[in-house]
A protein has these predicted regions:
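Sec-dependent N-terminal signal peptides
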Residues: 1-9
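Bacterial signal peptide processing site
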Residues: 16-19
Length: 240
């Protein structure tokens, strides 16, 4: 699992006793959407802020649009098109997917998308922005089989902004709790909010029963031909 491996790696680095370690560069200082425009690679920091990554090529992550954790430094350069010009110290992609449609019933959704326990963790990376819902989630792992995580739309006919997080442990032994990250592209998956902020409700089956939480959500401005890389993980592939 890329996200889990990343977090573990960062934890390991934090135990390094080397006095030369630059701790400001060990941990991520931003959650971004990686985008390209012509021959430029830029990072969408939030709904209004763009960062031109001068030391990154637009073909990073195969030229696909993904959410990512990044550690960057500001530069003194100016740009007429972007809010800031930055130097990327390191960047690591997050599993980035499109939501899936409800099959019409809880039984059908459980058979297709799973009904394993999952927890959503309150964290700075658990956020709805730039047309994405990014989640830090917690689940039981055994390390033997691939897990699947999906966001199901159309679960409430009366509210198109209600979605459901589904986890399929795929028969993996439930030995230990571990955290991971996933980002869902909500653009074209839920109705455009027309510039307004609405409540996006997400529900899930936790170890304490079913839960719900609301996010403030506003559709982003359209971009030309965004390319998604579904299930992309840079360092591991045991979650899809």
């Amino acid at each position: 699992l890329a996200a889990m491996m990343l977090l573990s790696a960062l934890t390991f680095q934090s135990c390094d006793t080397d006095n030369d370690t630059d701790w400001d560069r060990v941990f991520p200082n931003a959650l971004v959407t990686v985008k390209k425009s012509g021959d430029a690679c830029y990072l969408q920091l939030d709904d209004n802020t763009t960062l031109l990554a001068k030391n990154q090529h637009p073909t990073i992550f195969d030229g696909k649009e993904v959410r990512a954790l990044v550690n960057y430094s500001q530069t003194s350069e100016k740009s007429e098109k972007y809010n800031q010009v930055i130097h990327v110290n390191w960047i690591d992609s997050i599993l980035t997917k499109k939501p899936v449609p409800s099959l019409g019933s809880d039984i059908e959704n459980s058979e297709k998308y799973g009904n394993s326990l999952v927890e959503i963790v309150r964290d700075w990376v658990t956020v709805a922005e730039d047309g994405y819902l990014t989640l830090r989630f917690r689940a039981l792992w055994g390390g033997q089989k691939v897990h699947y995580i999906n966001l199901v739309t159309g679960v409430n006919p009366e509210n198109p902004y209600e979605v459901e997080l589904r986890h399929n442990a795929n028969g993996d032994p439930q030995n230990y709790w571990r955290d991971a990250l996933v980002a869902f592209n909500l653009n074209d998956a839920v109705p455009d909010t027309g510039g307004k902020t609405v409540k996006l409700t997400i529900r899930w089956r936790s170890s304490q029963g079913y839960k719900k939480v609301d996010f403030d959500y506003c559709s982003r401005k359209p971009i030309s031909s965004p390319k998604m890389l579904e299930g992309y993980s840079q360092e591991g592939r045991d979650i899809r």
